[in-house]
Amino acid sequence: MLESRRLLNYSGEVLLNTPSQLSLPLSLPDDETFDSFYAGENASLVAAIQTAIHQSHGSYIYFWSRDGGGKSHLLHAACAELSLAGDAVGYVPLDKRAYFVPDVLEGMEHLSLVCIDNVQCIAGDEEWELALFNLYNRVLELGRTCLLITGDRPPRQIDLQLPDLASRLDWGQIYRLQPLSDEEKIQALQLRAKLRGFELPEDVGRFVLKRLDRKMRTLFEMLDELDHASIVAQRKLTIPFVKDILKL
């Protein structure tokens, strides 16, 4: 089996070093912080995560949503906050596990924070399930690591083949990441725009929300495009300008 080791640098990149010395970078978005996360009805989850990463080593939180909804954003935010403080953190996106081998989890129990994203992606993979189960047990035994895990459904609804892993994931604090209403999506876009130094008028927000895919990732990508276009054209965002840029 191909051996692989995980290294994390504090600029927010996970590096996988193989025996061939090939490095595979997985960049963490530098704009996905707690400040840029619009919590809506998820304030209690955000507070729980912040408490856990700063005060509760040995803690475990699982949170889920079916449509994205900001799970990865919160994991990136947690990693960024602790890594900037000089703590060792690890982020493993299991939807990209083609770049990893399960041994990537070895030794992570010595980090301050471990984030496992999209755990449903390893359902039915015996080797990965066992590796995660063993990591969970090591984290529990040492009691020095905060473990954050996300999925697209509650732990008991994931079709895991290892019953003990399903049981472990069902322990601790479990949250559903509540979806944003249309009004909250506009406010989330306005918050992101404000942090980038420009304004998204409410009428423009309503306009794009009615005409584009309403998934937040799509909307944020649209906001990036509008930000760039407005800088190049030296224009504020208006409905006619947005219609022209987005070809609506």
Swiss-Prot record:
Q: What does the record list as GO biological process?
A: DNA replication initiation; negative regulation of DNA-templated DNA replication initiation
Q: Output the Gene3D superfamilies linked to this UniProt entry.
A: 1.10.8.60, P-loop containing nucleotide triphosphate hydrolases
State the Pfam families in the record.
Bac_DnaA (PF00308), Hda_lid (PF22688)
- Keyword annotations of the record: DNA replication, DNA replication inhibitor
Assembly, per entry = The active form seems to be an ADP-bound monomer. Forms the RIDA complex (regulatory inactivation of DnaA) of ATP-DnaA, ADP-Hda and the DNA-loaded beta sliding clamp (dnaN).
Q: Which PANTHER family match?
A: CHROMOSOMAL REPLICATION INITIATOR PROTEIN DNAA (PTHR30050), DNAA REGULATORY INACTIVATOR HDA (PTHR30050:SF5)
| Family, as annotated | Belongs to the DnaA family. HdA subfamily.
- Which NCBIfam families has this protein been placed in? DnaA_homol_Hda, PRK08084.1
Give the function comment from the record.
Mediates the interaction of DNA replication initiator protein DnaA with DNA polymerase subunit beta sliding clamp (dnaN). Stimulates hydrolysis of ATP-DnaA to ADP-DnaA, rendering DnaA inactive for reinitiation, a process called regulatory inhibition of DnaA or RIDA.
- Output this protein's name: DnaA regulatory inactivator Hda
Q: Which organism is it from?
A: Proteus mirabilis (strain HI4320)
